[in-house]
Amino acid sequence: MQGAKSLGRKQITSCHWNIPTFEYRVNKEEGVYVLLEGELTVQDIDSTFCLAPGELLFVRRGSYVVSTKGKDSRILWIPLSAQFLQGFVQRFGALLSEVERCDEPVPGIIAFAATPLLAGCVKGLKELLVHEHPPMLACLKIEELLMLFAFSPQGPLLMSVLRQLSNRHVERLQLFMEKHYLNEWKLSDFSREFGMGLTTFKELFGSVYGVSPRAWISERRILYAHQLLLNSDMSIVDIAMEAGFSSQSYFTQSYRRRFGCTPSRSRQGKDECRAKNN
């Protein structure tokens, strides 16, 4: 079965997190977060999701900020390679064609409420962490999870994401933007280096990310700066320059709009949390 070899026990991970402030994370492939205990808040460029135990998030490849609000939380992470997802769509194409098509912009995060069937599926996935099993069993369990997603109220959104994966330009665009978003390029430079006309580039970008290139680049830069702020000793002015902001004052304004406080206050809060933990 296609993809079975890549979905062994080591791929499904049980994580224990205690994140008082927002922490920057990069997912190099699509996947599912399942909140087992505690709290979990996940933000992308235009949405915030606060999960209760039993709820699930399908997240696309990309960058996010996460927090557990200082609570000990247990999360199940299920990575999904593009190859596996494409195989799922091909394998069950006739059945999945029954899912209503969605014309809305494709989101970066899709939330799924807890249901008895999803709870049973998650229980089976957790069992794979503690018992030896054939790799194909993990594949079947994850296909079951995706099928439940597809025929839930959020199924049309999920299918929009999965159908995009068959477009060879989508993954190339994602890799290209992750590599070059810090470059001081005009939008025309991005489109030229990608090998597309500006109008076509904008259309592809909007269909993949659901926002304009300028908005996405600004968000990625502010998230990168946030990560440096919390995890390095660089000065704020150096962080602003490193993340592609024209000045410290512009960075401070952008950061305040995004996180509701100044960079210096955010760093102070991180240091206070660290002192309490010590």
From Swiss-Prot:
GO terms for molecular function: DNA-binding transcription activator activity; sequence-specific DNA binding; transcription cis-regulatory region binding. Residues 171-269 form the HTH araC/xylS-type domain. One of its GO terms (biological process) is regulation of DNA-templated transcription. Induction: By cAMP-dependent DNA-binding protein Vfr that directly activates exsA transcription from a promoter located immediately upstream of exsA. Keywords: Activator, DNA-binding, Transcription, Transcription regulation. In the absence of inducing signals such as low Ca(2+) or host cell contact, the T3SS/injectisome is expressed at a low basal level and exists in a quiescent state due to ExsA sequestration by ExsD in a 1:1 complex. Upon host cell contact, this interaction is disrupted by the anti-antiactivator protein ExsC leading to ExsA activation. InterPro entries: ExsA-like_N (IPR054015), Homeodomain-like_sf (IPR009057), HTH_AraC (IPR018060), HTH_AraC-typ_CS (IPR018062), RmlC-like_jellyroll (IPR014710), Tscrpt_reg_AraC-type_HTH (IPR020449). It comes from the Bacteria. Disruption phenotype: Deletion mutants are defective in expression and secretion of type III secretion system-related exoproducts. Transcriptional regulator that plays an essential role in the activation the type III secretion system (T3SS) operons. In addition, ExsA directly regulates the transcription of ImpA virulence factor that cooperatively inhibits the functions of host macrophages together with the T3SS. Homodimer. Interacts with ExsD; this interaction inhibits ExsA activity. PANTHER family: ARAC-FAMILY TRANSCRIPTIONAL REGULATOR, HTH-TYPE TRANSCRIPTIONAL REGULATOR EXSA. This is HTH-type transcriptional regulator ExsA.
